[in-house]
Amino acid sequence: MTYRVIQWSTGNVGIHALRLIARHPDLELVGLWVHSPEKVGVDAGTLAGIEPTGVLATNDIDALLALDADCVCYTATADLRPAEALADMTRIAASGKNIVSSSVVPMIWPDHMPAGLRAPLEQACEDAAVSCWTSGIDPGWANDLLPLVLSG
């Protein structure tokens, strides 16, 4: 089975995800969201430094969410904009797409996040019968333990 995937951003994490999605035999890149206007209309492969994919970058959220996709790989920066990132993710879930994310670090352990912040996303996932899975280097090994071990 091939999963149809939209990549959401081309930043520090997103660019690596984009390369891997584009080249994975079980994944089909069907859309790419970009923040920068100068990236709109550019082939995803060109942005990722790989062969062309035929998928053009866009900042048109409605058009992306109208695509037939199984999943969105959401890697937009959320450190300074967690409410906006959660709003994006809620909108994605409400469109019927599963989410895999490295953004909004507290979503790694959602029960430790204020219920008022996570409730809209959880409700959208439940209503659309989709999932949201967040993972990454935070919290734990790379940002918490490794610097402590290396400094000692």
Predicted feature residues:
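N-terminal glycine-/serine-/threonine-rich beta1-alpha1-beta2 phosphate-ribose binding loop
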Residues: 1-94
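Gly/Ser/Thr-rich loops at beta-strand to alpha-helix junctions
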Residues: 11-13, 106-109, 113-114, 137-143
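Generic secondary-structure signature for well-ordered alpha-helical cores
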Residues: 22-26, 126, 130, 151-152
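Hydrophobic beta-strand scaffold residues
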Residues: 29, 99-100, 131-132
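Short, ordered loop/turn segments at secondary-structure junctions
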Residues: 35-37, 77, 97, 103-107, ...
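Short, hinge-like loop/turn segments at secondary-structure boundaries
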Residues: 46-51, 117-120, 150-152
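Rossmann-fold NAD(P)-binding glycine/threonine-rich loop
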Residues: 86-87, 94-95, 103-130
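Conserved anion/nucleotide-ligand pocket segment
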Residues: 133-152
